[in-house]
């Protein structure tokens, strides 16, 4: 298997952490679409949203997805990457999509424990636990619909990587 592996899920589910470890385990490259965008625009996600709005950000996000996709690469996508049907189709057709599933309470806890200065701005302006519940309610079907494999992301990163590797081996058999 050499095609790209796309990591999808809400903020805080572990896409970047797990993606790095998975890339090491497989000998693949690793790219985070948000970090790629920040490096190519010299702006944080919050800056892009402030200057161009969410629509402009989503357009940049879709372009970044296409630019970074290559064989033997793990791609950690932004939590909203699945909102565009074209992105879902692209990821599903070009590689294997892994959905790292975690409940809203765990996501909020992780985001509160590890706040980032350049973290995406709030979508709703409400407390993070409420926002994550709303985000999952709106996106859960999209994450599951695009995914080739759904992985429980409530475990430690090493256990999640082991679960992903097992799922990939089973699908390759």
Curated annotation (Swiss-Prot):
Q: Which UniProt keywords apply?
A: Amino-acid biosynthesis, Aromatic amino acid biosynthesis, ATP-binding, Cytoplasm, Kinase, Magnesium, Metal-binding, Nucleotide-binding, Transferase
Q: In which pathway does it act?
A: Metabolic intermediate biosynthesis; chorismate biosynthesis; chorismate from D-erythrose 4-phosphate and phosphoenolpyruvate: step 5/7
Under catalytic activity, the entry for this protein gives:
shikimate + ATP = 3-phosphoshikimate + ADP + H(+)
Q: Where in the cell is it found?
A: Cytoplasm
**Protein name (Swiss-Prot/TrEMBL):** Shikimate kinase 2
Query: What is the annotated role of this protein in its UniProt record?
Result: Catalyzes the specific phosphorylation of the 3-hydroxyl group of shikimic acid using ATP as a cosubstrate.
Gene3D superfamilies from the UniProt entry: P-loop containing nucleotide triphosphate hydrolases (3.40.50.300)
- Residues involved in ATP binding: 12-17, 120, 155
Q: What is known of its domains?
A: The LID domain closes over the active site upon ATP binding.
Identify the stretch(es) annotated as LID domain. Answer: 112-126
């Amino acid at each position: 298997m050499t095609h790209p592996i796309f990591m999808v899920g809400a903020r805080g589910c572990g896409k970047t952490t797990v993606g790095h470890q998975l890339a090491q385990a497989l000998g693949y490259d690793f790219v985070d679409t948000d970090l790629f965008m920040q490096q190519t625009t010299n702006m944080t996600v919050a800056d892009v949203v402030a200057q161009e709005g969410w629509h402009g950000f989503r357009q940049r996000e879709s372009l970044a997805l296409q630019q970074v996709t290559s064989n033997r690469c793990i791609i950690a996508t932004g939590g909203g990457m699945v909102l565009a049907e074209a992105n879902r189709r692209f990821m599903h057709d070009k590689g294997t999509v892994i959905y790292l599933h975690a409940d809203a309470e765990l996501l909020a806890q992780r985001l509160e424990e590890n706040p980032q200065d350049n973290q995406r701005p709030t979508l709703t302006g409400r407390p993070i636990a409420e926002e994550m519940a709303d985000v999952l309610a709106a996106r859960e079907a999209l994450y599951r619909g695009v995914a080739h494999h759904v992985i429980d992301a409530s475990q430690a990163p090493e256990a999640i990587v082991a679960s992903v590797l097992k799922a990939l081996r089973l699908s390759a058999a």
